[in-house]
From Swiss-Prot:
The lineage of its organism: Eukaryota, Metazoa, Chordata, Craniata, Vertebrata. The keyword Thylakoid does not apply. It comes from Homo sapiens. Transmembrane segments: none annotated. SUPFAM superfamilies: TSP-1 type 1 repeat. This is Thrombospondin type-1 domain-containing protein 8.
Length: 115
């Protein structure tokens, strides 16, 4: 009795599957419905925030960019992550409109102080 090529491949594939260890990440255990989306996604986002907080330094002081009517502050990467971390620029630099009390050295036409 001749076997089909698919049947000949099935047995080795099943043995390979049984011999291959499964990778289970503890971060992705399902914890049930919490009413605010998928629990796995919440754990993943929490883990990413912990990694970012562990590798980023504190925010620096605000500095005036009065020619642009804005203030800027930044922070630096001070540690290393256990894996690749891709950060958006807003995690390293923040901008806000400048105010007269924050920029006493600026001339009135440099900033919109109504904000």
């Amino acid at each position: 009795m001749a076997r089909t090529p698919g049947a000949l491949l099935l047995a080795p594939l099943l043995l390979l599957q049984l011999a291959t260890p499964a990778l289970v990440y503890q971060d992705y255990q399902y914890l049930g419905q919490q009413g605010e989306g998928d629990s796995w996604e919440q754990l993943r986002l929490q883990h990413l925030k912990e990694v970012e907080d562990s590798i980023l330094g504190p925010w620096g002081k605000w500095r005036c960019l009065c020619d642009l009517g804005k203030q800027e502050r930044s922070r630096e990467v001070v540690g290393t992550a256990p894996g690749p971390v891709f950060m958006d620029p807003e995690k390293l630099i923040q901008l806000r409109p400048c105010r007269q009390r924050d920029c006493p050295s600026c001339k009135p036409f440099d900033c919109d102080w109504r904000l």
